[in-house]
Design a protein with these regions (language model features):
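Periplasmic-side early beta-strands and strand-to-turn transitions of outer-membrane beta-barrels
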Residues: 1-16, 47-51
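Extracellular/periplasmic, surface-exposed regions of secreted and cell-surface proteins
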Residues: 18, 24-33, 38-43, 81-137, ...
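Acidic, glycine-rich flexible loop segments
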Residues: 54-89
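Solvent-exposed loop segments that connect transmembrane elements
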Residues: 64, 138-154, 319-330, 380-389, ...
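Extracytoplasmic gating/loop element in the C-terminal half of outer-membrane beta-barrel translocons
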Residues: 258, 554-639
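Conserved small-residue
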Residues: 391, 408-526
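C-terminal extracellular loops and terminal segments
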Residues: 393-397, 439-460, 519, 525-539, ...
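Glycine-rich, aromatic-lined ligand/substrate-binding cores of catalytic
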Residues: 525-561
């Protein structure tokens, strides 16, 4: 099959053109041997722009064009220097930002069934993806001109390449002996992944239209890239047994070896055990008119996560330059002790169906998951001289319940109505932290969140607020608490004034401490995880009409609206348009506690509970109404049989 998509975007100079081709071949070579080949390929070209943010922040009182039709460029002075405001129309129409993607996937297999119950499968797959990007800013744009300082255009070329090969061998054997049914599966897989990236930027081209290839740029600006690869070898064995379709048992064992870890920690092993009891097959329920299906199940097993950087356990170095001299600098610290992250899961579930044809059905499941050796890329202290390292630094426990129900409320020939509902609740707790990677006893601060032993993950961490300073008297009262320290000063130029957010001194030492790695005045502000979440859907059909609706909900989580805080930070070097909430800011004429005043810098923007909001929601994702034409009408057209 062949498909073509050709569409223009809603934004100026955006488009998407994509070709895709699918080929399938399956054939029986003889009675016991079968082969097949599948090919999927796609070729796409996308014209794109990052102009939306530029347009949203552009001053609405400035024109896009001069009276003669040329582009308008707004000039202004900042600290004695002439600067220019970006014109979003120039960026949209003149910037040449195109990505071309080429992808191909080939899968071939051989299946042999030499005798009853035995199946052998050999499969090879190859996945290739290449992405080339060209991003050219002509000299008339703000970026391409170097801020209108005479630069003659700027071009960045990028290329990404990924190749993934997988060889899989599988043996399956199954047999039924009277009431006993069992099957055994063994799988071996070798996966080879390669990824590369290259980017190069040059400036100053002969013109903006024809001589704009990367080699025609005169001034070198920047380059970067990488070439990575990883191998994964996996073995899986699984056995299923059932007696009279009533008692079920599954045992599995998996071994994974990854080159992403050091030789001493390359392999990890993941066993599992699951049992189930189908009560419906018991005589006392076989003819029950209320309980149509009932199954109890329980399982315990271990799964692993080994996705870290391809050379995550090694110390890496980066190539750079300083004063036009080449140099090699440390990139990340190696860790020979880095190992697989492992999660042991315990699950107990009930599958049910009531009344004829499972008029009401669903599941109820309880689970407990214990994760050890949590993988994380840890930011190191600046004094070490290396930016980061991959580490195993935490243990986490999750406990929860999942419930879903499906009901066929009405089910007649012309009218049917069904409804589905699900809800989940999860509780988690940090049960351990590696002492080498904690910032204070028992906790580790990660930007605006904190991981603390004994508490949940996803906790916002920062300063508590107490409204807004309304007058100088309130400020003077706080400054008097500690004559040796300013009450609330993040920067040396930061001086409190009416309209600023008031932060609380939780340590009671008379001032709010902003020193790095000082947590005396910081506290947990809320959680990004909900108390519970779920979804629902309904479908109503009457003759040829069908109405359907689906939605999701979440309750109890908080969200930090970063963009909201930025509306009250003034950037004199680059004035921009703001959201209308800035009109509700504090002023002497509007002494509100809703929003602070706009200021050049200070503590009004940052992680405080002032910018945290209740993120509970109820969302309707989809509503549709369709009508299906009667089949006899369509037969009269001659298009269908």
């Amino acid at each position: 099959s062949y498909g073509l998509i050709d569409e223009e975007g809603m934004l100026v100079n955006t488009s998407n053109r994509r070709h895709n081709l699918n080929l399938n071949l399956d054939t029986d070579l003889n009675k016991w041997l079968k082969m097949g080949v599948t090919f999927r390929g796609d070729l796409s070209k996308r014209g794109q722009t990052e102009n939306f943010n530029v347009a949203a922040e552009a001053r609405p009182d400035l024109p896009c064009y001069n009276e003669d039709g040329s582009y308008y460029v707004h000039k202004y002075m900042y600290q004695g220097e002439e600067r220019f405001e970006s014109n979003p129309m120039i960026e949209a129409k003149e910037r040449d930002n195109v990505n071309q993607d080429l992808g191909a996937n080939i899968t071939s297999y051989l299946v042999s069934r030499p005798f009853g119950g035995l199946s052998l499968r050999l499969q090879y797959s190859y996945n290739y993806k290449q992405s080339k990007g060209r991003d050219f800013y002509p000299s008339m744009t703000l970026y391409g001109s170097g801020g209108y300082k005479g630069q003659k255009g700027q071009l960045t070329n990028t290329e990404r390449l990924s190749e993934n090969q997988e060889l899989m061998g599988q043996i399956m054997y199954g047999k039924r002996i009277k009431k006993h049914n069992f099957d055994i599966t063994m799988v071996g897989t070798l996966t080879d992944s390669k990824n590369s990236y290259a980017s190069m930027t040059f400036a100053d081209f002969p013109d903006d239209k024809t001589q704009t290839s990367i080699w025609q740029g005169v001034t070198y600006k920047d380059q970067m890239g990488y070439d990575k690869g990883a191998l994964l070898l996996s073995y899986v064995a699984r056995a299923n047994y059932s007696f009279n379709d009533r008692y079920l048992l599954t045992v599995s064992w998996r071994a994974d070896g990854s080159s992403r870890f050091s030789p001493d920690n390359r392999w990890s092993y993941f066993p599992s055990l699951a049992v189930a009891y189908n009560l419906t097959e018991e005589k006392f329920l076989r003819h029950n008119k209320v309980i149509n299906f009932l199954k109890l199940r329980a399982s315990v097993g271990k799964v692993g996560m080994g996705y870290v950087d391809e050379y995550g356990w090694r110390t890496l170095y980066d190539a750079t330059e300083y004063l036009d001299q080449p140099a090699i600098v440390p990139g990340s610290m190696g860790n020979n002790n880095l190992k697989w992250e492992g999660t042991v899961s315990y699950e107990l579930g009930l599958d049910y169906g009531f009344f004829k044809n499972n008029r009401i059905s669903g599941t109820l499941e309880f689970y407990k998951k214990k994760t050890k050796d949590l993988l994380y890329r840890y930011t190191l202290s600046p004094g070490i001289g290396l930016p980061s390292a991959n580490v195993n630094f935490a243990a986490i426990e999750n406990r929860g319940i999942d419930f879903d129900i499906n009901a066929k409320i009405i089910n007649t020939r012309n009218l049917s109505w069904s409804f589905s509902f699900n809800i989940s609740k999860n509780l988690n707790k940090v049960t351990g932290l590696d002492s080498k990677y904690v910032s204070s006893p028992g906790s580790s601060a990660l930007n605006n969140t904190v991981i603390e032993e004994g508490k949940s993950v996803g906790l916002f961490y920062g300063y508590k607020s107490d409204g807004i300073f309304q007058n100088w008297e309130e400020i003077e009262a706080c400054e008097a608490l500690n004559p040796d320290m300013p009450y609330q000063q993040k920067f040396s130029s930061d001086v409190l004034s009416p309209g600023d957010i008031k932060l609380l001194d939780l340590s009671n030492d008379g001032y709010v401490n902003f020193t790095a790695n000082n947590y005396e005045d910081k506290t947990v502000l809320g959680s990004s995880l909900p108390d519970f979440s779920g979804g629902f859907s309904t479908r109503l059909t009457y003759k040829g009409f069908t109405f359907s609706m689906s939605g999701t909900f979440s309750y109890g989580n908080m969200k930090s609206w970063d963009a909201e805080g930025r509306q009250f930070q003034f950037n004199a070097a680059r004035p921009k348009n703001l959201l209308d909430i800035a009109l509700k800011r504090w002023t002497p004429e509007n002494p509100t506690n809703d929003y602070p005043k706009i200021r050049l810098n200070g503590t009004n923007y940052g992680m405080t509970d002032f910018w945290l909001h209740d993120a509970s929601y109820l969302k309707i994702n989809n509503i549709s109404l369709t009508y299906q034409l009667p089949a006899n009408w369509l037969r009269r057209t001659g298009f269908i049989d």
